[in-house]
């Protein structure tokens, strides 16, 4: 349940279907529910969509019609293009949106419309998290809270109307997570939210998510983004999910 999925339907005169966790666990039944209700917009996590896409592949011979122009909004996790392309085999008119945003910034901070090529396939090596939505500002900053050049990884800070007032009765946590905007010192009420997410700006102006700052591994003096390795592993046809975990050898050194 998110702000975007809860309120958007009412802005366009659509109906909202909210299912219990039990009903969404059975992806075969979920797939048929989407078909029976003629769902035109689906908001779902990438891991849940992966199960849904696999279920459709398993039921390849079944007739499960869906609206031709259905839109699928994914968010909260890294997206597998394999799942998207598997789905497009059955529903070539469907299109996907990658939505990014933490709860502290009212969930929706950036979005990316995922393009398809001439063969109606997604051929991106990694799906970006896109550009900021209206009334939202994004900053990629280094540890000195200075701007990072395009292509250089840094921590993502979010500003704008969607930034919350903070955590209830947690002043220490608020001071760490919500910081004064160093680029607008004239307004002391203007704050940025530190996401802890490491991103970089692509040549297109879109943001690419690289991982969590607290998931960086320092190995023999090199800072390694575990998320980048995980993303590369997931692109292999024999890999469904991947997690990179540092280990220590007998001497206690990371390997």
Task: Write out the residue ranges for each language-model feature.
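AMP-dependent adenylate-forming
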Residues: 45, 50, 81, 89-98, ...
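Conserved AMP-binding
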Residues: 1, 22, 103, 160
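Conserved AMP-binding/adenylation subdomain of ANL enzymes
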Residues: 2-40
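Glycine-/small-residue-rich active-site loops that bind phosphorylated ligands and cofactors
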Residues: 23-26, 79, 250
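Structural motif
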Residues: 21-22, 45-47, 76
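Short hydrophobic/charged patches on amphipathic alpha-helices used for structural packing
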Residues: 28-31, 61, 230-231
